[in-house]
């Protein structure tokens, strides 16, 4: 990220987060359609959604909760969420070798890295250059399972995709909220 106005840094980070979230949501739907029987789908009201590792992070869970946090806190939560996916996402291309949706899966890792760099650039700007090194959360999510003939592996991947989608939605929401707070745009729909 070259030196640029803070508003541009936020705009770029929001766009990257939106793009990744849409890609995650599309992939989740494609995976569900292709591999998960109707009665086992999370979208069914009676089924239990996957437990996401990110639920153990003390990140805000709703918009009201997020509005109580400082921009720096929201950036830290966003960074932790993004970093928790850097390792597992590298296995996505093996899981979705023949998927049209994930034809760009090799680029998901790069897109996540770009978003990570964007968040770190925002943190440096807001901390006036006193940015501490990134803290990579351990443990992160497990790797995706490349065995798609095994029902347990399918359900594990399905759960991971669900968490990936949820976490990217959180990051997108936090970034939009900060951008709206700082620049008071009239079209601030979160």
From Swiss-Prot:
Places the protein is found: Secreted
Family: Belongs to the somatotropin/prolactin family.
UniProt organism field: Crocodylus novaeguineae
GO biological process terms held by the UniProt record: animal organ development; growth hormone receptor signaling pathway; positive regulation of growth; positive regulation of receptor signaling pathway via JAK-STAT; response to nutrient levels
This protein's name: Somatotropin
Residues that coordinate or bind Zn(2+): 19, 172
Cystine crosslinks: 52-163, 180-188
InterPro entries: 4_helix_cytokine-like_core, Somatotropin, Somatotropin/Prolactin, Somatotropin_CS
Keywords recorded for this protein, A-Z: Disulfide bond, Hormone, Metal-binding, Secreted, Zinc
GO cellular component, one term: extracellular space
Molecular function (Gene Ontology), one example: hormone activity
Function: Growth hormone plays an important role in growth control and involved in the regulation of several anabolic processes.
Keyword Disulfide bond: yes
